[in-house]
UniProtKB/Swiss-Prot annotation:
Disease named in the record: C1q deficiency 1: An autosomal recessive disorder caused by impaired activation of the complement classical pathway. It generally leads to severe immune complex disease characterized by recurrent skin lesions, chronic infections, an increased risk of systemic lupus erythematosus, and glomerulonephritis.
Domain Collagen-like span(s) in chain numbering: 31-109
Subcellular location field: Secreted; Cell surface
Free-text comment about domains: The C1q domain is the ligand-recognition domain, which specifically recognizes and binds the Fc regions of IgG or IgM immunoglobulins.
Glycosylated residues (UniProt): 33, 48, 67, 100, 146
Segments forming domain C1q: 110-245
Modified positions (5-hydroxylysine) in chain numbering: 33, 48, 67, 100
SUPFAM superfamilies, per database record: TNF-like
PTM note: O-linked glycans are assumed to be the Glc-Gal disaccharides typically found as secondary modifications of hydroxylated lysines in collagen-like domains.
Organism name: Homo sapiens (Human)
Name the UniProt record assigns to this protein: Complement C1q subcomponent subunit A
Cysteines paired by S-S bonds: 172-190
Positions of region (Disordered): 27-114
Description of activity control: The C1Q subcomplex is inhibited by sulfated molecules, such as triterpenoid sulfates, heparan sulfate, or chondroitin sulfates.
Length: 245
């Protein structure tokens, strides 16, 4: 067994030594490059690379496309601030009449103010154009001032005033009123006689008055002689018809 194995080793060493000697003593030149081989099979796809940086915008050369379909409504935003009030709208249609209310409690006429007065001339002061009826007959609520001859309104409403004045001469009288200091001549009455007989000049009217308004009788400076005697009297009266609403 050892004989053949030893011979085999010796043969291999001899061949190797011979090759080394041959290479050192006689080296042949390199041959020409061979022809390119056929392309190999396509390799497997490589791994996906990382995302690159965004490129520069391209030049827009295409035609704008058609408008797309309307998208879905977005979520509701936060409530806005309260705006300014808008202009008033047109007047609406008249509503249906409401149900009749319950009957109220009966009123008491005694609780209502009822200003009224009557005054005559007995010993009036001389001078001036205001006809002063100095003697009071009735003065409910005391609206009449006998020292000045003026009625002063304390309850706004509609009033009736009247006068009857005795004279033997030509006479002209007027019912005069004032409101907030503005005097206005309301209505005038005149009568004439040439025989010196007694005559009565009378007049009356309805006035709407506010609180503080005044009413009086005034004579014409040239035609204002009033008879003064005990056998006949001149009278000035007034009263509230109904108060203002």
């Amino acid at each position: 067994m050892e004989g053949p194995r030893g011979w085999l080793v010796l043969c291999v060493l001899a061949i190797s030594l011979a090759s080394m000697v041959t290479e050192d003593l006689c080296r042949a030149p390199d041959g020409k490059k061979g022809e390119a081989g056929r392309p190999g099979r396509r390799g497997r796809p490589g791994l996906k690379g990382e995302q690159g940086e965004p490129g520069a915008p391209g030049i827009r050369t295409g035609i704008q496309g058609l408008k797309g379909d309307q998208g879905e409504p977005g979520p509701s935003g936060n409530p806005g601030k309260v705006g300014y009030p808008g202009p008033s709208g047109p007047l609406g249609a008249r509503g249906i009449p409401g149900i009749k209310g319950t009957k109220g409690s009966p009123g008491n006429i005694k609780d209502q103010p009822r200003p009224a007065f009557s005054a005559i001339r007995r010993n009036p002061p001389m001078g001036g154009n205001v006809v002063i009826f100095d003697t009071v007959i009735t003065n409910q609520e005391e609206p009449y001032q006998n020292h000045s001859g003026r009625f002063v309104c304390t309850v706004p409403g509609y009033y009736y005033f009247t006068f009857q004045v005795l004279s033997q001469w030509e006479i002209c009288l007027s019912i005069v009123s004032s409101s907030r200091g503005q005097v206005r001549r309301s209505l005038g009455f005149c009568d004439t006689t040439n025989k010196g007989l007694f005559q009565v000049v009378s007049g009356g009217m309805v006035l709407q008055l506010q609180q503080g308004d005044q009413v009086w009788v005034e004579k014409d400076p040239k035609k204002g002689h009033i008879y003064q005697g005990s056998e006949a009297d001149s009278v000035f009266s007034g009263f509230l018809i109904f108060p203002s609403a």
